[in-house]
């Protein structure tokens, strides 16, 4: 019922700034990213207990991920939109103005996670499996930053859940259109459902209802997120392009292939990774998950 009510709303951004105190300002985008990181640490710490990973290590990992993911997300975006920054290189650092790419964040975060895992001598797949639910949750939260910045929206629409875009934020091709697909909302809901699915799979594995192996949740994330992104990206008006191809869709297709091949490798070829999920311990609180 709540989702139905939400979809009946017309969305209008109040602006990118939450509050201004003299020369200082707090922007919605930064607040949402910070909230996503904190909630992600909490969730992954709970999951880590069942993967024989020190929960305290998750906070350390989060620092590595932020250092790796956010600059990579920005540089990925700038690389494909260089014409916007060539004459204003200082604007590259103005990340609070928007303009980051999740695929860049995933690449940078993955590199940071691999380095962290090697330094801590922790199996990589154990770490990725406890991180991906938090990643999906963080994406669900972070997409609302696009709403406040009036960016990353879709094509014009008259649907009840349409999004109003100020004239100075509209593409020239749609300058006369006022309302657009709220693709931020589509992806936010998709990622939230993906997060819930991953947590459900984790719980089923703990209860030995599913033969969950290390790496499976990572593969499911790659497939699930990418399927949604291919659909949603087709609606957007500001896609990063390589010629006539949408880069996010191409990367998503590659990610799906990796996810499917990973599942085949784990289960189909009988070369599975170790089953590192501990079964639920009698008397242990299930609320930990």
From Swiss-Prot:
The protein's annotated pathway: Protein modification; lipoprotein biosynthesis (diacylglyceryl transfer)
The protein's name in its UniProt record: Phosphatidylglycerol--prolipoprotein diacylglyceryl transferase
Keyword set includes Protein biosynthesis: no
Alphabetized GO MF terms: phosphatidylglycerol-prolipoprotein diacylglyceryl transferase activity
Compartment(s): Cell inner membrane
EC class name: transferase
Pfam families documented for this protein: LGT
This protein's UniProt keywords: Cell inner membrane, Cell membrane, Membrane, Transferase, Transmembrane, Transmembrane helix
Membrane topology note: Multi-pass membrane protein
Residues bound to a 1,2-diacyl-sn-glycero-3-phospho-(1'-sn-glycerol): 143
An example Gene Ontology CC term for this record: plasma membrane
NCBIfam families, per database record: lgt
InterPro entries the UniProt entry points to: Lgt (IPR001640)
UniProt entry tagged with the keyword Cell inner membrane: yes
Family under the similarity heading: Belongs to the Lgt family.
Transmembrane region(s): 21-41, 53-73, 95-115, 122-142, 182-202, 215-235, 247-267
EC number in record: 2.5.1.145
Alphabetized HAMAP family for the sequence: Lgt
